[in-house]
């Protein structure tokens, strides 16, 4: 476990390899004055005309008919929310669809690098399946193919054709089709969904995933954790990636740690360098622990 005193809250002028985990199973002195948030969701109608599924290749989700001039309706969040108030995982039959992990975060934060690292670490331990989301390309799926993350038949690509968060929360149908296709053809024990890059307000529907990981990176500056948003405050695990860039961008890892703890309360977070697999074993521990809890308490298969 990480001792927050290891690197303090001063400036960091040298490289850090923070592959330790903050799981907050012990008491902390938290600054709760500004940390309490409440999420208010307002439902809006969605009339989406969708494309079609292309076998094992990819799914299209295009031609959205919307009510707002800017493109489509959104959930409106008055506050970033508390970790303790996040949506609870659904009790469901995991024989119908395997335990599903959703990985989200801004563009360039390292989501695909994390997916690749997870595939490399877990593919010899259990059968996997991956669904990627991009707006108009299959770039992330192609990256996984080039790097031989998994056999091609275990990867599906969804082209959302619009804002990525809609495909993981408001209209999850195309991702569900891709996940069901993987279940039918390769019978994975663990499924991973990678969202397209989006903003701090993006969060997965619990109808789609059982466990959420939100990835931010140091290159965005040490202010990112305190900006909040459901991804920061209510993901099951927050990953602060690319810690090696801290001295190059003037980011203070101590400040990021302090703010992540303040914003997340008891919610776990950790530092990582996913492209070097630093922190990845700890991420896997969190995933497998959640998977064991969910599958041992799941209702019996029908």
Swiss-Prot record:
Q: Where is this region: Disordered?
A: 1-76
| SUPFAM superfamilies, per database record | P-loop containing nucleoside triphosphate hydrolases
Q: Compositional bias (Basic and acidic residues) at which positions? A: 1-32, 40-56, 64-76
Q: Which UniProt keywords apply?
A: Chaperone, Cytoplasm, GTP-binding, Nickel insertion, Nucleotide-binding
| Residues noted as binding GTP in the record, renumbered to the chain | 105-112
Its biological purpose is as follows: Facilitates the functional incorporation of the urease nickel metallocenter. This process requires GTP hydrolysis, probably effectuated by UreG.
The family annotation for this protein states: Belongs to the SIMIBI class G3E GTPase family. UreG subfamily.
Q: Which NCBIfam families match?
A: ureG
What protein name is recorded for this chain?
A: Urease accessory protein UreG
């Amino acid at each position: 476990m990480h001792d927050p005193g290891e690197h303090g809250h001063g400036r960091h002028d040298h490289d850090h390899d923070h592959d330790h985990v903050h799981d907050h199973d012990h008491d902390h002195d938290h600054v709760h004055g500004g940390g309490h948030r409440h999420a208010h969701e307002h439902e809006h109608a969605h009339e989406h005309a969708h494309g079609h599924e292309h076998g094992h290749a990819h799914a299209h989700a295009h031609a959205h008919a919307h009510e707002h001039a800017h493109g489509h309706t959104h959930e409106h969040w008055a506050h970033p929310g508390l970790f303790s108030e996040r949506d609870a995982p659904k009790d469901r039959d995991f024989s119908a669809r395997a335990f599903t992990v959703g990985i989200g975060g801004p563009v360039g934060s390292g989501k695909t690098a994390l997916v690749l690292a997870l595939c490399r670490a877990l593919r010899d331990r259990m059968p996997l399946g991956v669904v990627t989301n991009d707006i108009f390309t299959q770039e992330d799926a192609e990256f996984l193919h080039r790097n031989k993350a998994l056999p091609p038949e275990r990867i599906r690509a969804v082209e959302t054709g619009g804002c990525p968060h809609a495909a993981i929360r408001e209209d999850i149908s195309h991702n569900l089709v891709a996940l069901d296709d993987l279940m039918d053809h390769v019978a994975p024990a663990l499924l991973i969904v990678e969202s397209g890059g989006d903003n701090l307000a993006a969060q997965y529907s619990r109808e789609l995933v059982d466990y959420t990981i939100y990835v931010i990176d140091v290159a965005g500056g040490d202010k990112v954790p305190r900006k909040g948003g459901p991804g920061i405050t209510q993901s099951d695990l927050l990953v602060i990636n690319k810690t090696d860039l801290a001295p190059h961008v003037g980011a203070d890892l101590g400040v990021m740690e302090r703010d992540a703890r303040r914003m997340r309360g008891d919610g776990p977070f950790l530092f990582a360098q996913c492209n070097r697999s630093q922190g990845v074993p700890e991420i896997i521990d969190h995933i497998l622990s959640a998977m064991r809890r969910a599958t041992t308490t799941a209702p019996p298969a029908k």
